[in-house]
């Protein structure tokens, strides 16, 4: 739910539900929600850094900002990428966030604060089962990153655009070539 609309009503419904459970001392969903909300911008930032041929320069620059937003639990850092290519990007992000949330819940991770990204790690006892939480976050981020690699097409570079590319048939048909 956190990756479906990245800050939209579905995302906010999941977040609000988890925050409401904190008052009842139910802390597992908050951990899953925050980790799953961090996964989309982290995955896009990582993918933009690793797979430069699948992102233009503007997207690679936005990927750097997405990493900072991701560690801060600002899911909206993924919106520019999803808005540009929603049918490829959103399913990849949902898959990774689902993996993150599932590992977090299965591992019994609990988060006693409603926001803060990785900065909550500095608060003593704010995260129960921190190692499992980090594994969940890493696993989901890698799932989304790998999925993005598989579904995003390489972007044409400046030397491969149709206007500057010489067709192979032209060079092969010239005498002496």
Which residue ranges define each predicted feature?
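Pore-lining transmembrane helices
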Residues: 1-162, 167-168, 172-176
């Amino acid at each position: 739910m956190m990756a479906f609309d990245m800050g939209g009503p579905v995302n906010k419904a999941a977040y609000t539900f988890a925050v409401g459970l904190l008052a009842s001392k139910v802390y597992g969903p908050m951990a899953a929600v925050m980790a799953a909300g961090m996964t989309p911008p982290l995955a896009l930032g990582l993918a933009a850094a690793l797979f430069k041929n699948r992102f233009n320069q503007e997207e690679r620059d936005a990927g750097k900002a997405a990493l900072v937003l991701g560690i801060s639990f600002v899911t909206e850092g993924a919106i520019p990428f999803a808005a540009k290519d929603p049918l490829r990007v959103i399913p990849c992000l949902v898959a990774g966030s689902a993996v993150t949330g599932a590992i977090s819940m299965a591992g019994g991770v609990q988060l006693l604060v409603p926001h803060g990204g990785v900065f909550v790690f500095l608060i003593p006892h704010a995260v129960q089962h921190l190692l499992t939480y980090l594994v969940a976050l890493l696993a989901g981020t890698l799932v989304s990153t790998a999925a993005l690699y598989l579904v995003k097409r390489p972007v044409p570079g400046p030397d491969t655009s149709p206007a500057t590319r010489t067709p192979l048939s032209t060079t092969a048909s010239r005498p002496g070539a």
